[in-house]
Each structure stands twice: as C-alpha cells, then as structure tokens.
Amino acid sequence: MTSRQQAILSAIVEQYAEVASPVGSSLMAKLFHVSSATIRAEMAELERLGYIMQPHTSAGRVPTDKGYRFYVNNLAESEPALLVEGRAERALAARVQHAGAPERMIRNAVDTLVELTHNLGLATIGNQLYISGLSNLFGQPEFIGGVNVKQVAQLLDNLEPWLREAAPNEPLSVYIGQENPVGRAAGCSLIISRFRSPFSDRSYIGTLGPTRQSYRDVMNLVSRAGQELEEVLYV
C-alpha cells in the first residue's frame, strides 16, 4: 500500500466514525487536493485489497475489519505512548480517586468511560462482569431495529468466562469485528486494558462499541483508565 493510500484509508476510517455514512470520492478529493478521478482510482485499489467496501445502497465506501485493523496497527506503531490529556484525563482521575472502596473505583471508571466514549463500558470485578451503558451501544445506527442484538447479548454472556480463561496479557488489546473471540457476528469492537487490582492481577476494563468508532480517542481513554486504576488500587 502506498503512503497516499494509507492516508486515504485513515481519512475514510475517521470520517466514517464521525458521520456514520459512507465516504465519497468528492470529499476525499477536497481533503487531499487531487481530482476525484485520482481518488476513485486509489479507492478502487483499496477495495481490491480488501480494506474498504461499497455498501449496496451507496456510492461511498466504508472500512472493512481488515481496514480497521490496518488503521489500529498504524496507531499503535506511530503513537505508542499517547495519553489522554486535559478534561477527559482529569475526569477519569477524579472519579477513580474519590470513589473510596476498590469496587466503587472500578465502577466509576467504567461509568466515566461510558460518558466519554458513548460506548458500552465494562470491567471485571473478581468473577463478575460490571456493564454500563447498554443503551449507548444499542442507540448506535448499526444496531437500530434490533440488528445484531442477539449476537451482542451472546458476546456479553460469554465475555467474562473468556477473559478468565484466555487472560489477555497485553496492556491494551483491541478486537475488531470478526476478531472478537466470543462474538464474531456482533459487528462490534472490544477494547480492553489489563490492570492489577485487589481482585486479580489480571483485571480488565474497557469498552464495547460498533466497529465504526474513534479508535484513537477510545484506545487512549481505555489505556488511561487501566493505568489510573492500577496506580490507585495496586499498592
């Protein structure tokens, strides 16, 4: 993939996350200051490679799971140490530090993630899975009319046992669409951060949202939540 194709793919991912509608060549042409014909040729190649696709009802393009994975991998490589700054970081820290009991700290961190990301938030507390913001998830355009609701419910039912058995060891893990080990058909991305707590050396906090989301912002927030909880709880 050329550097321009990478930039176009990133722009499609970010634009689609913002507007929730397929991205057309005319908008990309304005962003990159080239002709629409040039953009159409580049998008055709990205589609041939499997990074974007054309919905049946639109002339625009949307990212595929493969496209999202390429984008997320690039984020991790180019911005490995990004931290959330400003108001969001302060909100997370305040909600955690002023909560009192460890369980309340974790719940507050999840609730704050829900408010900041507009996704479903979750965390393990011992052998329990705390979930908040289900209405956020089902309020997204991808799930209107009950689409994939059963698959999402199955994912949530099986998530805590899977986390306990698989015990992902990375500080931050991102499972996109079909990569989800317990909900491949749900059309969701699971972003989780591992942290140490009084309940377990492998506790997890994160979000579940549609594959269409602002990965940079959500990954930073989830990573920061895990760091904050470990700093406060694991002493």
Name every feature range the model reports, one short phrase each.
Residues 11-18, 22-74:
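N-terminal helix-turn-helix
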Residues 5-9:
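Short, leucine-enriched amphipathic alpha-helices that occur as contiguous helical runs
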